[in-house]
Regions:
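N-terminal export leaders
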Residues: 5-11
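Alpha-to-beta junction loops
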Residues: 63-66, 82-96, 193-196, 210-218
Length: 227
């Protein structure tokens, strides 16, 4: 699960534009508002395509008012550094992992453990309901950002460099399994019987290729897109 975040100052600016519709057009004869977007997603990943749809929709809704700049592959900011970049005013929008939010808003660690969310419908119910809205509020207050929405990453599936019959935790003994860098995910990796290895998503494919790690448990569409 990932979340789309936007700087609060930008929300205020967008609201001001929306409310000032009655002003003369000359009042807005100014440069476009930059919207720098950072995501670790690769071009073929549907999360990257999501941002393209966002850009096209915004250009259609507010033509000429925003300069949307989509930075893929964590090329603008390394995964996990986006909140600090947003706080400094160097980034407006990002898809950020729940465990990176939990570093600044510990209450959000509720959503960093495995198997908390059953499926897309359950995720939507949780985050559209009182629990999710309260967590959004806490994160916004502590990080000075506005959480726009959650993004369903997919069902996590274990995949290894070498063929191995895995039926019990004992079958993963000695396997260096890449996990997200939160203590909850690392605990899950150990509970599965593997040697949990924290690694940013953007480094996973090369690490698999070189043997730095033996496996990972991302959704298969995400893995295929990153190849």
């Amino acid at each position: 699960m990932k979340l789309s975040l936007i700087r609060r100052s930008l929300v205020a600016a967008s609201a001001a534009l929306a409310l000032a519709g009655g002003l003369p057009a000359t009042a807005f004869a100014q440069a476009k508002i930059p919207l720098r977007i950072s995501t670790p997603a690769v071009p073929d990943d549907w999360h990257a395509k999501m941002w393209t749809v966002f850009k096209e929709s915004l250009d259609k809704s507010a033509p000429g008012e925003f300069d949307v700049q989509i930075h893929l592959n964590a090329t603008l900011f390394k995964q996990g550094t986006e909140p600090a970049a947003m706080a400094r005013g160097n980034l407006e929008l990002a898809t950020i992992s729940a465990f990176d939010i939990a570093k600044l808003a510990p209450e959000f660690s509720l959503f960093t453990a495995g198997y908390v969310i059953r499926d897309p419908q359950h995720q939507q119910q949780v985050f559209d309901g009182p629990i999710g809205q309260e967590m959004f509020k806490l994160a916004s207050e502590k990080m000075d950002v506005t959480v726009l929405s959650t993004i369903y990453l997919g069902t996590r599936q274990l995949n290894l460099r070498e063929v191995r019959n895995v039926r019990t935790p004992a079958d993963l003994k000695g396997v260096k399994l890449r996990m997200p860098g939160s203590k909850e995910w690392l605990f899950l990796g150990e509970a599965l019987g593997a040697t949990a290895t924290p690694l940013a998503f953007g480094e996973v494919y090369l690490a698999l290729k070189t043997g730095t790690i033996d496996g990972q448990d991302n959704p298969l569409p995400t893995v295929r897109a990153a190849k």
